[in-house]
Amino acid sequence: MLDTVAPGPDIDVLMNDIGRKAKAAARPLGFASTEAKNSALNAMADAILANKAHILAENAKDLKDIEGTEMLASFVDRLTLNDKRVAEMAEGIRAIAALADPVGEVIAAWDRPNGLKIERVRTPLGVIGVIFESRPNVTADAGALCLKAGNAVILRCGSDSRRSSQAIHACLVKGLKAAGLPEHAIQLVPVTDRAAVGAMLRGLDGAIDVIVPRGGKSLVARVQSEARVPVFAHLEGLCHIYVDASADIEMAKKIIVNAKMRRTGICGAVETLLVDGAAIGTHLTPLLEALTDAGCEIRASPTVLKVAPGMKPATEEDWSTEYLDAIISVAVVDGISGAIAHIQTYSSNHTEAVIAEDPDVVARFFTEVDSAILLHNASTQFADGGEFGMGAEIGIATGKMHARGPVGVEQLTSFKYRVHGAGQTRP
């Protein structure tokens, strides 16, 4: 069990000490060798597998703590670990180790007429603060990604996942020690008091460079409202799929059922289905039947109700609701123009997909829809750093900063300029 500290000044003292240790660890970590970082990551993966029984036992305690509460099934799913998920956690860390090291990469270079040679080079951000709720796997993903990018990280888990996160964190520290890297490079806040979150949002006396929240809408909204440091975040995953009249119906059914029902509680799950009005007679009923057969509840627009009067009517609130459950809103729209208008009105700018064979429809969708991730003829559940080949992700960002979409190792870097001269002076 994590230690507890009474709220008040002691929390600030504790958190500022954590910040100082993280900042001190970030300095040598910023120029640690690729070999040392990869050695630590592989040792972390080994430790997670070796301690699987302990991790699962601690996770069982976390799950027991929420028995009898009115938690959504999606919440319980995010909190739950099993043999497969622990193995995937270790595999994800190894995948991060296998990635190219972004630190020191020359991302642009040019010569000036005066002979100066200029390079733009990737550098670590410094210290990342990650605040998360019911996802114990974030402990491993965030710790590994930050390490690979040369950053120290301060992890603050929710009380619901505290035992699981502590067990995983112990494995990460073993990996750091085995590779001779600073053990304070990955720290887990040892208290569940919410004052610790407030301290992190204030930046821990200048120690934290970026905050990444992973959790529900209320957590993310608080972080975005109160943070005094930059934030990489998305408020919610209100994802849409538009099915054009040109879409292959069998493909559309397969994609939509997967996008909704594979895992209903993740931010990449589709929440609204938009069907081309020109396809009511060919596509709408098969799509509704496929979703219903898969166990999904449908909230239907007036036009959809005319075709399927037994469905539950959608309210205005439904179009802006992230269900995180086996529920989907369905509307008929006036072609690609209607789909874009609906998405612009209700989207959270996370992930949208178009199912179509008409290249002009796809091109317009990709040009005019301004969400972080756009897919053509593929499930929205591919909105994931691992699926993008990033090894894992620390989160999905929907803002307009340099980190947008899955936040992987490259997005956890900044850059500096190196300018080589031969005695030039400015006239």
Curated annotation (Swiss-Prot):
Pfam families: Aldedh
Listed InterPro entries: Ald_DH/histidinol_DH, Ald_DH_C, Ald_DH_N, Aldehyde_DH_dom, G-glutamylP_reductase_CS, Glu-5-SA_DH, GPR_dom
SUPFAM superfamilies: ALDH-like
Protein EC: 1.2.1.41
The keyword NADP belongs to this UniProt entry's keyword annotation: yes
Swiss-Prot/TrEMBL keywords: Amino-acid biosynthesis, Cytoplasm, NADP, Oxidoreductase, Proline biosynthesis
Family, similarity comment: Belongs to the gamma-glutamyl phosphate reductase family.
Function: Catalyzes the NADPH-dependent reduction of L-glutamate 5-phosphate into L-glutamate 5-semialdehyde and phosphate. The product spontaneously undergoes cyclization to form 1-pyrroline-5-carboxylate.
HAMAP family given in the database record: ProA
Stated name of the protein: Gamma-glutamyl phosphate reductase
Species of origin: Rhizobium johnstonii (strain DSM 114642 / LMG 32736 / 3841) (Rhizobium leguminosarum bv. viciae)
Primary gene name: proA
